[in-house]
Amino acid sequence: MGCCFTKRRKSEKAEGEEEQPKLYSWDQREKVDPKDYMFSGLKDETVGRLPGKVAGQQFVIQDCENCNIYIFDHSATITIDDCTNCVIFLGPVKGSVFFRNCRDCKCTLACQQFRVRDCRKLEVFLCCATQPIIESSTNIKFGCFQWYYPELAAQFKDAGLSIFNNIWSHVHDFTPVSGELNWSLLPENAVVQDYVPIPMTEEFKAVRISTEANRSIVPVSRGQRQKYSDESCLVVLFADDYTTANARKLIDEMVGKGFSLVQTKEMSMKTEDAQRVFQEKASDFLLLLNKGPVIALEFNGDDAVQECHLIVNGMFNGTKMFVSEKKETASGDVDSFYNFAEIQMGI
């Protein structure tokens, strides 16, 4: 006589056995404590976050007085509310930096968008990919971002920001007052460290910082300051493995010879764009446009066109670049490219 065995069905649970809840991807994310991404109600302190400690999160700074605040990392957005007499450094911000109801603050920061509302007496060394905007604010002063530490270049990439897209001086005032100017540019000889000093506390000694212009991750440009000369030169570099390095090398050479860097831009171009900007020379560059965005540089100074040609032919022989052909048409080259760039930004 045989024995009869029955298997327990999978749907049946052994006595005392509890069904485990399902785990979803959003349940497995690392829990974020908002307190780790906030400085609030501080007074007379030096605080900050080291590289890797913010890692693209949002950050809030509020109700701080007489504080030195350093965020040595990239973030999503940062709001600064109700702060007085503070020194603030912000690494690259993917979205917006928004100051509200702050006064007597000195800052160095990089972001996609910069907004100031209900503030007075801010001094800002800025890298901003879009037009900085102020509203209901007075005595706001701007200079070009000028800062270096080893992790900063990678943080710009993580934040999706180009070091060449910086219109720091193209400020728009939403609430202008007739006969008054609510914003201005910092003195040309302003020393960044006099405004935003390198932190000397033990926590930040490991961050190898420099505020020298020739080491700044973001090229230091004149922006809308008056040009020294009537002669400018446009140089456009096309995408390859060394485009950024070549642009930096060319800037170093030209600035080292006494020329000024007025403005920079990194953006994609189509065939019709190249034909409009480069005109009869466009056919020389059409195949290069598919490789990636171009980098444009405007240099200013007497004999800028001649010197650009000498440097490009001597240092970058074999690398295709557009360089203004002669000084009589160089200003037209600059206008054609940057007018095109402004139109693209408005689309």
Swiss-Prot record:
GO cellular component: centriole; ciliary basal body; cytoplasm; cytoplasmic vesicle; cytosol; Golgi apparatus; nuclear body; periciliary membrane compartment
Matches recorded under Pfam families: TBCC
Domain of life: Eukaryota
Limits of the C-CAP/cofactor C-like domain: 21-176
Signal peptide: none
PROSITE patterns reported in the protein's UniProt record: C_CAP_COFACTOR_C, NDPK_LIKE
Membrane topology, record value: Lipid-anchor
Lipid-acceptor residues (S-palmitoyl cysteine): 3
The protein's name: Protein XRP2
Name of the coding gene: Rp2
